[in-house]
């Protein structure tokens, strides 16, 4: 009788019922997070096709180009939202940081597009676009902040194993540094 009592604790278990995610699950999730961000990075890598000699085509060309960029950022944000409840305890924190960064990029692009669309001459068009380019450092800082969040959330090593994250880290700056 004593043996049976000793073998069965009879008490309630305090162990968590939540399964610990495998590293492979976290890497796969992180790859999706970086893939969502990479969609915007790739969209931002091309230059607008513009005709500097025709003010109406200049305005339309830049506005259309910005419209495709806003759409890419919107897709990234939507894709990120779907990843908020990932397998890592800090999933939501990391994804929210990425969403915030994408939101800043979207605001800059949408505000520039609005200025372009309301401009009445080529000088205003060029000024609005030049202002946006002048804020490119803000965009780069946004990317650096997301990279920093990888480390703060303990996901830096995982990010190095995710193919889409490697692509983000190796992405050269499209902004001239001179």
Annotated model-derived regions:
Residues 3-6:
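C-terminal motif of bacterial Sec signal peptides marking the signal peptidase cleavage site
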Residues 8-11:
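Bacterial signal peptide processing site
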Residues 31-38, 42, 63-74, 96-110, ...:
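Generic structural signal for well-ordered, non-transmembrane alpha-helical segments
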Residues 121-127, 173, 177:
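Long, low-complexity or tandemly repetitive, helically biased scaffold regions used
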Residues 160-178:
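Short, low-complexity, Pro/Ser/Thr/Gly-rich segments in the mature regions of secreted, periplasmic
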């Amino acid at each position: 009788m004593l043996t049976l009592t000793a073998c069965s604790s009879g008490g309630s278990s305090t162990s968590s019922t939540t399964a610990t995610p495998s590293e492979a699950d976290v890497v796969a999730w992180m790859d999706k997070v970086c893939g969502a961000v990479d969609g915007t990075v790739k969209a931002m890598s091309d230059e607008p096709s513009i005709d500097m000699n025709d003010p109406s085509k200049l305005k339309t060309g830049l506005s259309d180009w910005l419209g495709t960029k806003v759409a890419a950022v919107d897709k990234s944000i939507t894709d990120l939202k779907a990843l908020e409840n990932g397998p890592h305890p800090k999933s939501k924190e990391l994804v929210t940081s990425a969403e915030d960064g994408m939101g800043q990029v979207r605001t800059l692009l949408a505000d520039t597009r609005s200025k372009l669309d309301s401009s009445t001459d080529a000088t205003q068009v060029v000024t609005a676009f030049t202002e946006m380019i002048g804020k490119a450092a803000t965009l780069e800082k946004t990317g650096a902040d997301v990279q920093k969040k990888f480390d703060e959330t303990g996901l830096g090593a995982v990010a190095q194993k995710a193919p889409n994250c490697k692509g983000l880290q190796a992405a050269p700056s499209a902004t001239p540094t001179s």
